């Protein structure tokens, strides 16, 4: 069974052609392999560039008539008088408020937005950083305004066509990978992106129009007399409209005036966040990771432009504070011993770019509004950030609310009756409650999983913590992985694609610029293949006692240029000679070589041996004359810990000063 989109325009307009729109057949059994065959990806210096998408869209032959401008004929053939435009008041100019204002404006409504401070995102300004907009929200934006959605997607960094998922915080090993690409392309949805909150807000504000947004206008109260709604600003000004939408955040004044005061729920976690000028070695293959630990976890995401956004969550009571200039130091202590992917980002972030906030949410409620007033976004269902769906749900809310108001106006025009605003608001609320409630619960479950995650037996057991040295996998980790592997595809399919059929008039399409690597499916199934695909420089950084006088060793990826390590130079042997003038190092100690993107060390029957400590803390002596595979974050010792080196994979080679800072930071951690 196929559901096919037909593109039937014989004479497409120049505006359509300028967008490079192409016809595409969408099948329920649409194969990602077919999608992979489309050439679309642009790379420069190994980093993904943003390419304006090629997409499919049906051409509409005539401009739509908004419901408020619609006329009809009475029984005697006389035209009815066009209806007066609805006056919509919006409290809050954050993402949800602006998206709804845009949706309402596109449908011909008279909109007025009140925002306390449009110069910065509420609470954290420019340092709050990027936001992830997933496929479901991008599709809703397309249904609201295709051109604005295009601007947003072009300004964003695509992460959904790379590997994303959960890893163990200490070892860095993959725990579970998320496929957000297949659910999107199979349903003709845009692929997930990350975009700066400030950039997103600026695009939306420009599209809404400065004449619609009243800056420095804080709504503190409202009056609903059944016929109209009047908002009261902090400065005493009053404005009247047909309805009021509260989009004023987790501490919503509109919500408080509707249902009385209530406290937000503390998640149990405080969150540090920052943006680092850093490019991970696997930036081309990995979009974002969630590093799991016991009662702490760490999230990192590529945000484009050579920057990484990170969030560090730590379980502790609310209201804590750090010593002056003490955030970075505390984080290095909390996450000391974690994998390099975490430590690298903390080291690369300036102290004054790190912010701290406690994480709150609000439990789902059955009442979203009353009379001519309703709520959307964080004002009614603030979520924990673990699924990246908080802003996405606000965007979906905005589309649905504007749609219900449009339907009410259409019914009014058809039957010549007053617009039933109250019923349309309740219809919007009913349409959204179940989906929002489920996703809200999933976000909480993700936090619970992070709270209870234990990699090994003994973690969090106090006197029994010595058991961790035996590296026995915790049964909960093993069972949890089975559950996640089975349930995650279904969950992602529903979260990303479950709202697509409600987007009336949106044509399913795929952008060629969102093409994934041909090896994406293999990377999901094979961790080794994913590591081999890493296009980076491999280095050995001095890391042991007494090794501070040693220099970093840059390894060659050329299979014909091995490195020979010894206490004397070996210029007569093909390849690169590395001299370590230490008594524990034999004259010809070991050889390091590269094969198919992987690195191996071979001990050449040295007197004191070659030792490897892997990323899970297991130390072993390599067999003589037998190549032993090593990985980033492993430690290699040539004879003793005085000639110990930590394996690093870097996107760009480090300068000498940076190598010293990296070594000092790792040793301190």
From Swiss-Prot:
Quickly give the catalysed reaction: all-trans-zeaxanthin + 4 reduced [2Fe-2S]-[ferredoxin] + 2 O2 + 4 H(+) = all-trans-violaxanthin + 4 oxidized [2Fe-2S]-[ferredoxin] + 2 H2O
Report the record's Gene Ontology biological process terms. Answer: abscisic acid biosynthetic process
Co-factor requirement: FAD
UniProt-listed Enzyme Commission number(s): 1.14.15.21
Instruction: State the pathway, as annotated in the record.
Output: Plant hormone biosynthesis; abscisate biosynthesis
Per its UniProt record, what Pfam families does this chain match?
FAD_binding_3, FHA
Query: Where's the transit peptide in this chain?
Result: 1-49
Does the record's keyword annotation contain Transcription? no
The residues that the entry says bind FAD are: 87-115, 365-378
Q: What is its main location?
A: plastid
- Provide the alphabetized UniProt keywords: Abscisic acid biosynthesis, Chloroplast, FAD, Flavoprotein, Oxidoreductase, Plastid, Transit peptide
- GO terms of molecular function: FAD binding; zeaxanthin epoxidase activity
Q: Does the keyword Protein biosynthesis apply?
A: no
- Top-level EC class, please? oxidoreductase
Record domain FHA: where: 553-617
List the GO terms this entry assigns under cellular component, sorted alphabetically: chloroplast; membrane
As for subcellular location, the record says: Plastid, Chloroplast
Q: What does this protein do?
A: Converts zeaxanthin into antheraxanthin and subsequently violaxanthin. Involved in the epoxidation of zeaxanthin. Plays an important role in resistance to stresses, seed development and dormancy.
Q: Which PANTHER family match?
A: PTHR46496, ZEAXANTHIN EPOXIDASE, CHLOROPLASTIC (PTHR46496:SF1)
> What protein name applies here?
Zeaxanthin epoxidase, chloroplastic
Organism of this sequence: Solanum lycopersicum
């Amino acid at each position: 069974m196929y559901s096919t989109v037909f593109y039937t325009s014989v004479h497409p307009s120049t505006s359509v052609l300028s967008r490079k729109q192409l016809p595409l057949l969408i099948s329920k059994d649409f194969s990602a392999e077919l999608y992979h065959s489309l050439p679309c990806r642009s790379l420069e210096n190994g980093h993904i560039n943003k390419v304006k998408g090629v997409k499919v869209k049906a051409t509409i032959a005539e401009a739509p008539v908004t419901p408020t401008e619609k006329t009809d004929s009475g029984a005697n053939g006389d035209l009815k008088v066009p209806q007066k435009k609805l006056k919509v008041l919006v409290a809050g100019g954050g993402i949800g408020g602006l998206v709804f204002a845009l949706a309402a404006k596109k449908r011909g409504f008279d909109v007025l937005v009140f925002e306390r401070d449009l110069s910065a995102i509420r609470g954290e300004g420019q340092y709050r950083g990027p936001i992830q907009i997933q496929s479901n929200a991008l599709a809703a934006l397309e249904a609201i305004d295709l051109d604005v959605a295009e601007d947003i997607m072009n300004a964003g960094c695509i992460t959904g066509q790379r590997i994303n998922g959960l890893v163990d915080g200490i070892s860095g090993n993959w725990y579970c990978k998320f496929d957000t690409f297949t659910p999107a392309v199979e349903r003709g949805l845009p692929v997930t992106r990350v975009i700066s909150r400030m950039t997103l807000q600026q695009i939306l504000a420009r599209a809404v129009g400065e004449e619609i947004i009243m800056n420095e206008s804080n709504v503190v109260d409202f009056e609903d007399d059944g016929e109209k709604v009047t908002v009261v600003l902090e400065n005493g000004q009053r404005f009247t409209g047909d309805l009021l939408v509260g989009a004023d955040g987790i501490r919503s004044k509109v919500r408080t005036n509707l249902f009385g005061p209530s406290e937000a729920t503390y998640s149990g976690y405080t969150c540090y966040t920052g943006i680092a000028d850093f490019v991970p070695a696997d930036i081309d293959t990995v979009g974002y990771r969630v590093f799991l630990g016991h009662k702490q976890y760490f999230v990192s995401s590529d945000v484009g432009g050579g920057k990484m956004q990170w969030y560090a969550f730590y379980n502790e009571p609310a209201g804590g504070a750090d010593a002056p200039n003490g955030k970075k130091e505390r984080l290095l202590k909390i996450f000391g011993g974690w994998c390099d992917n975490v430590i690298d980002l903390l080291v690369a972030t300036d102290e004054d770019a790190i912010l701290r906030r406690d994480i709150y949410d609000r439990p789902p409620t059955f009442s979203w509004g009353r009379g001519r007033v309703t709520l959307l976004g964080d004002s009614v269902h603030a979520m924990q950030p673990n699924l990246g769906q908080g802003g996405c749900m606000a965007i979906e809310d905005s589309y649905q609310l504007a749609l219900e108001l449009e339907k009410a106006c259409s019914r009014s025009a058809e039957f010549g009756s007053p617009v039933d605003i109250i019923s349309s608001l309740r219809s919007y609320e009913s349409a959204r409650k179940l989906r929002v409630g489920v996703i809200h619960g999933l976000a909480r479950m993700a936090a619970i999983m992070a709270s209870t995650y234990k990699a090994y037996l003994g973690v969090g057991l106090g006197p029994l913590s010595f058991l961790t040295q035996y590296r026995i996998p915790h049964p909960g980790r093993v069972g949890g992985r089975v559950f996640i592997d089975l349930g995650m595809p279904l969950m992602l399919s529903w979260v990303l694609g479950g709202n697509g059929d409600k987007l009336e008039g949106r044509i399913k399409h795929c952008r060629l610029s969102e093409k994934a690597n041909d090896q994406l499916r293999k990377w999901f199934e094979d961790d080794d293949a994913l590591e081999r695909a890493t296009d980076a420089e491999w280095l050995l950084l001095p890391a042991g006692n007494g090794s501070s006088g040693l220099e970093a060793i840059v390894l060659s990826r050329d299979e014909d240029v091995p490195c020979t390590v010894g206490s004397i130079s070996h210029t007569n042997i093909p390849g690169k000679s590395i001299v370590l003038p230490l008594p524990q190092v034999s004259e010809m100690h070991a050889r390091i070589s590269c094969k198919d993107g992987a690195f191996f060390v071979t001990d050449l029957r040295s007197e004191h041996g070659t030792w490897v400590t892997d990323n899970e803390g297991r130390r072993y002596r390599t067999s003589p004359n037998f190549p032993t595979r090593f990985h980033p974050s492993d430690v290699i010792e040539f004879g003793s810990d005085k000639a110990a080196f930590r394996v690093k994979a870097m996107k760009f080679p480090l300068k000498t000063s940076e190598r010293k800072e990296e070594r000092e930071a790792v040793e301190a951690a």
